[in-house]
């Protein structure tokens, strides 16, 4: 399974680690993904999704059905 949010599509970002002497080495900034079981009232079943922490925060405000329509 890819390290990508199943709802937003958020994935890793390429960047640099910069030392004090400004030497740059490439690094991969991974998305903060968590596996969550989320209840869907319309589907009447649990959904096991790998989602970003921003989506988990949005789930406290909106239902999963509202987020799936995005």
From Swiss-Prot:
GO terms for cellular component: cyanelle; ribonucleoprotein complex; ribosome. Keywords: Cyanelle, Plastid, Ribonucleoprotein, Ribosomal protein. It is found in: Plastid, Cyanelle. GO terms for molecular function: structural constituent of ribosome. This is Large ribosomal subunit protein bL28c. The keyword Ribosomal protein applies. The gene is rpl28. Belongs to the bacterial ribosomal protein bL28 family.
């Amino acid at each position: 399974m890819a390290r990508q949010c199943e709802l937003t599509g958020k994935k890793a970002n390429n960047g640099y680690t910069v030392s004090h002497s400004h030497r740059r080495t490439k690094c991969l900034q991974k998305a903060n993904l968590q596996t969550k079981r989320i209840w869907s009232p319309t589907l009447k079943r649990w959904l096991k999704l790998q989602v970003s922490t921003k989506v988990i925060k949005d789930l406290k405000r909106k239902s999963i059905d509202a987020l799936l329509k995005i």
